[in-house]
Amino acid sequence: EMCIRDSIYIDDSSGLTPTEVRSRARRIAREHGGIGLIMIDYLQLMRVPALSDNRTLEIAEISRSLKALAKELNVPVVALSQLNRSLEQRADKRPVNSDLRESGSIEQDADLIMFIYRDEVYHENSDLKGIAEIIIGKQRNGPIGTVRLTFNGQWSRFDNYAGPQYDDE
């Protein structure tokens, strides 16, 4: 089902293949003079029927196809991804690139990998309540690191953080 409103096109079809996403994106770009952004929520819900017996190869094909689509249409593709549960076993729960579920090809193909971390999710008595961290795990053309934001849970909103950006400030 396609919802078109104020130049935002939402397709909530489930289990799309990269070929179907590419076809729909091309059509929208042709009919509306381009696309500003493609967002996939989330990558692991996509399928490649010919590779369905090997999930690693399937995710690799999905990742490569989305990268090719970004280049073809000259548009950023934001693909949301699940994390492995392995981070639950670590003392520091901040995600790292290898925590991306079926991560090898995603990590390789991505130009930018970002995570959102909120300490209060894992530690009830955290000193960092109301603070979120944007962790830049990979940036092909720039630095990696962490940026703090204020998180307003009532509105699910992130704002500029006015306090110290790092623990040692």
Question: PLM features: what roles do these ranges have?
Answer:
Residues 9-11, 15-18, 22-35, 64-74, ...:
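C-terminal regions of RecA-like/P-loop NTPase motor modules
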Residues 27, 35-80:
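Helical hairpin unit composed of two closely spaced alpha helices linked by a short loop
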